[in-house]
């Protein structure tokens, strides 16, 4: 079983209340984009204004924090907004409480948006499919705690490790756009899945987009045919919704 030690540093979480969306479908245009976020050592930065990926940078790149041209970033299954610990923009995220991105929503008050105010252990180096590979290398990195799944490692009173001491397990504190539980490796349970949640993302300049991740393993053409590939993400978005 592959266990990943996770820790969380809280820097004052903004409350995430849910305004009630209007029940009628909107007439907005829904865009669909595929982002290659398979690399463990990079974040991929996307601009809603430009409708495309505009930068790819190493996970600890400091210069990207001063860049206000990006709005949302992807690292495997972790997400950032241009705000707080991740950037100097006016970004943030809000969980709408619906699963249909075509449903009209109400943009909440500014204080309902949560900036990137937490860090969590993220894998920055790992070799898939190599039984001799070293354990994953992790580092505490900033992320958005609404768009990303937040976890902690707790003692599992029902199991013991090889040394006879109590084993640990992953506790999911919040489900973001994509959920991953590495405890499920080698079991019949899914290791990763989609929450199917719709979010409002506030951009670096204070505008708003609606977003929903609809695939976290988009197929890639290989010698074996179309192969589902973890970290190949497809998301839908509507911009602007102001």
What are these regions (language model features)?
Residues 19-242:
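Surface-exposed, beta-sheet-biased, low-hydrophobicity segments with strongly acidic/polar composition
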Residues 11-15:
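C-terminal motif of bacterial Sec signal peptides marking the signal peptidase cleavage site
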Residues 1-3:
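Bacterial N-terminal signal peptides that target proteins for export
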